[in-house]
Amino acid sequence: MSEGVELKELKRRMDGAIAAFKHDIASLRTGRASANVLDPVTVEAYGSRMPLNQVANIMVPEPRMLSVSVWDKTMVGAVDRAIRESNLGLNPIIDGQNLRIPLPELNEERRKSLVKVAHDYAEKSKVAVRHVRRDGMDGLKKAEKDGDIGQDESRAQSERVQKMTDEVISEIDRLLAEKEKEIMQV
């Protein structure tokens, strides 16, 4: 196993933490409608819980409106119930086989609460990145101890791992700042 491959693996795992963070913050509701808002909603369907996007089509016809087209008309009630019980503060309006969901304006308190959730997601991602860094550093120490690489090579690799970690954490901070600005925008 060469050290270059190990660095690529560490980078892949760190990029995975960024991707997970992007997914987490995409589901946070901002002032604009986004189909991702309904990602956490699961519906009791056909004897099991299913993600909403597996029983309906979600569209954004207007900036403050979501439209959910349920594929099976017998599921409309279950989808309505799931959205109401999801703690997202949304109240669908049933219109035949479709549900229209007006998105209310976010008040200051709700905005601050969403920013706090975004910070929690960011911290969770940073912890994951630091775990990857620790795994990389432990691997380098072991390789040095086993005599696979020299002390100079180990130090150089450690610096590269630290630089990679710093870059990934600053990317998470940048994404967080963007999302925070988007949430607080009235």
From Swiss-Prot:
Family: Belongs to the RRF family.
Gene label: frr
Subcellular location: Cytoplasm
NCBIfam families with a match to the protein in the record: frr
Matches recorded under HAMAP family: RRF
Pfam families, sorted: RRF
Function comment: Responsible for the release of ribosomes from messenger RNA at the termination of protein biosynthesis. May increase the efficiency of translation by recycling ribosomes from one round of translation to another.
GO BP terms in the entry: cytoplasmic translational termination
Residue ranges of the region described as Disordered: 135-162
Record GO cellular component, one term: cytosol
Molecular function in Gene Ontology: ribosomal large subunit binding
Protein name as catalogued: Ribosome-recycling factor
Keyword line: Cytoplasm, Protein biosynthesis
SUPFAM superfamilies on file: Ribosome recycling factor, RRF
UniProt main location, coarse: cytoplasm
Lineage of origin: Bacteria, Pseudomonadati, Pseudomonadota, Alphaproteobacteria, Hyphomicrobiales
InterPro entries: Ribosome_recyc_fac, Ribosome_recyc_fac_dom, RRF_sf
